[in-house]
Swiss-Prot record:
GO terms for molecular function: structural constituent of ribosome. Keywords: Ribonucleoprotein, Ribosomal protein. GO terms for biological process: translation. This is Large ribosomal subunit protein bL27. The gene is rpmA. InterPro entries: Ribosomal_bL27 (IPR001684), Ribosomal_bL27_CS (IPR018261). Belongs to the bacterial ribosomal protein bL27 family. Residues 1-25 are annotated as: Disordered. Pfam families: Ribosomal_L27. It comes from Corynebacterium kroppenstedtii (strain DSM 44385 / JCM 11950 / CIP 105744 / CCUG 35717). GO terms for cellular component: cytosolic large ribosomal subunit. PROSITE patterns: RIBOSOMAL_L27. The keyword Lyase does not apply.
Amino acid sequence: MAHKKGAASSNNGRDSESKRLGVKRFGGQQVKAGEILVRQRGTSFHPGENVGRGGDDTLFALKAGAVQFARKRNRRTVNIVENVEAEPAKA
């Protein structure tokens, strides 16, 4: 019977911190300019209309509006559809 734990058990017990990746704002949600839409490693989602891409591939809103997910040329894209405010009707 061993009186020491052995190399394996004492070498285990480490884990990296979670990176909190994923979609942060979903389709139809209203966002302001600068809000983060998707945190990702690589380009699972590509930037579309009114969406910018950061150095770590984070997608963020360039303008205020509603989030819209779409497919373009077999790529998943994220767009921001600007809010078009209707003018009051003139009588």
